[in-house]
UniProtKB/Swiss-Prot annotation:
Subunit note: The membrane-bound hydrogenase complex is composed of MbhK and MbhL, and may also contain MbhJ.
The protein's name: Membrane-bound hydrogenase subunit alpha
Species of the source: Pyrococcus furiosus (strain ATCC 43587 / DSM 3638 / JCM 8422 / Vc1)
Biological role: Alpha subunit of a hydrogen-evolving hydrogenase that utilizes protons both as a substrate for hydrogen production and proton translocation. Acts by coupling the redox reaction via ferredoxin and iron-sulfur (Fe-S) clusters to proton translocation across the membrane thereby conserving the redox energy in a proton gradient.
Temperature dependence: Optimum temperature is 90 degrees Celsius for membrane-bound enzyme but 80 degrees Celsius for the purified enzyme. Membrane-bound enzyme has a half-life of 2h at 100 degrees Celsius whereas the half-life of the purified enzyme is 30 minutes at 100 degrees Celsius.
Source superkingdom: Archaea
Protein activity control: Inhibited by 0.1 mM Cu(2+).
InterPro entries: ComplexI_49kDa-like, NADH_Q_OxRdtase_suD, Ni-dep_hyd_lsu, NiFe-Hase_large
Originating gene: mbhL
EC number: 1.12.7.2
Cofactor note text: Binds 1 nickel ion per mole of protein.
Key word Metal-binding present: yes
pH dependence: Optimum pH is 7.0. Active between pH 6.0-8.5.
Length: 427
């Protein structure tokens, strides 16, 4: 008899307990086996680029920070580097060291958060409690250094806004000592626990070839054995003086990279140790001197407005992978004519979608979590050029909203009005 296969398509998201943020995946299944994953972006779009092109260079710094709450420093830092390249602005050496310190503090908190999320997603909440308890220490230090647990506003064009004094240095050194005592326990649980290994080994394997073809970045790429880290390859700032190098699974486990969820977690654990080393070296080597080139923001904006046409690209290794910001300026404008961020989740999301083919449906959540997706800074609009142009007013949007609501629920009554009064539900 001829074998007949029945494939089923099910939606995963956009609202689902297994997702940190709204996003939609259409899963094609053959029984419990995943045949295809179709990624549907757009549920978190906030029009950040559109807003940015209507702001000046300084205002965009605060906008860039709010693209992502976990790696707010990374976005601002990368944007600022793009503007500095465009304008030819030199950054004081002390400011470069402070940037390293804040960046590595952010990396520690981001990796600990993701380790806890993965533990929770496989039902191992002991790991969640261990990692998130440890994460509180670095959050306290970030608050002491910047004044905030999130959105630190430390970086500015041409330097940093705040210095790191002796009190903050002592807090960071105490934190490093604390983590050198705590991390061995977290590492032991993650790398040598049979339950975790059974759930993470050989799940959502990203072969090295696939990672290269799909443009994977960060721990997702390094977990497949690719030695790539933009802090290292770009010789970024003072990182070369601090002994930066890419971390691969072989450095942590001693085994050749397989490219599975386990290896991606191993890379993050290895990078926690690397961040502690970088912090120690940065605090030890940081020179005295000024922390920014321009004392006032209005002086900075005036200088940028006088520049001729130009463009700049900023690259930085955010916790999730390589982050890129592109800026193009125009003479006489106090803001860019084009600002384009490229987030690490964008290539990683499509990489993991391909890697999920052939896996069990039960592994979907932990596989997605293993790339540590940030969907709020990834979403964008696709502009389809059909030769038509339509401008929708607030009234038009209200009318479309009510029409859609009536399609979903015919019992809803109401009409669009200039005052924006919505619908009323019939009794």
């Amino acid at each position: 008899m001829k074998k007949v296969e029945y494939w089923v398509k099910i939606p995963f998201g956009p609202i689902h307990p297994g997702l940190e943020e709204p996003e939609k995946f259409i899963i094609t299944l053959d029984g419990e086996r995943i045949v295809n994953v179709d990624v549907k972006l757009g549920y978190n779009l906030r029009g950040v680029q559109w807003i940015g092109m209507r702001r000046n260079y300084v205002q965009i710094m605060y906008l860039a920070e709010r693209m992502c709450g976990i790696c707010s420093f990374s976005h601002n830092h990368t944007y600022v580097r793009a503007v500095e390249e465009m304008a030819g602005i030199e950054v004081p050496e002390r400011a470069e060291y402070i940037r390293v310190i804040v960046g590595e503090l952010e990396r520690i908190h981001s990796h600990l958060l993701n380790l806890g999320v993965v533990g929770h997603d496989i039902g191992y909440d002991t790991v969640l409690h261990l990692t998130w308890l440890a994460r509180e220490r670095v959050m306290d230090v970030l608050e002491a250094v910047s004044g905030n647990r999130v959105n630190y506003s430390m970086v500015t064009i041409g330097g940093v806004r705040r210095d790191i004094g002796e009190k903050q240095k002592r807090l960071i050194l105490d934190m490093i000592k604390y983590y050198r005592e705590v991390l061995p326990q977290i590492e032991d649980v993650f790398l040598h626990d049979s339950t975790i290994e059974a759930r993470l080994r050989d799940v959502a394997v990203v072969p090295k070839k696939l990672a290269i073809e799909m443009g994977a970045v960060g721990p997702t790429a390094r977990g497949s054995g690719i030695k790539e880290d933009s802090r290292w390859s770009e010789q970024l700032g003072v990182y070369p003086d601090l002994g930066i190098k890419p971390v691969t699974p072989e450095d942590v486990t001693g085994e050749k990279a397989r490219g599975d969820v386990y290896d991606r977690m191993a890379v993050r654990i290895g990078e926690l140790w690397m961040s502690l080393d970088l912090l120690e070296h940065a605090l030890d080597q940081m020179p005295e001197g000024k922390i920014k080139t321009f004392p006032k923001d209005n002086i900075l904006v005036a200088k940028l407005k006088l520049l001729g046409d130009g463009e700049g690209i900023g690259r930085y290794e955010a916790p999730r992978g390589e982050l890129v910001h592109y800026v193009r300026g125009q003479k006489g404008r106090d803001g860019p004519v084009r600002w384009k961020p490229r987030e690490p989740t964008f290539p990683n999301l499509f990489t993991i979608a391909k890697a999920l083919e052939g896996n069990e449906l039960a592994d979907l959540v932990v596989a997605i979590a293993s790339i540590d997706p940030c969907l709020s800074c990834t979403d964008r609009v696709a502009i389809v050029k059909e030769g038509k142009k339509v401008v929708l007013t607030e009234k038009d949007l209200l009318k479309l909203s009510i029409e859609k609501t009536k399609e979903i629920n015919p019992n809803v009554k109401g009409d669009p009005t200039p005052t924006g009064i919505g619908c009323s539900r019939g009794v």
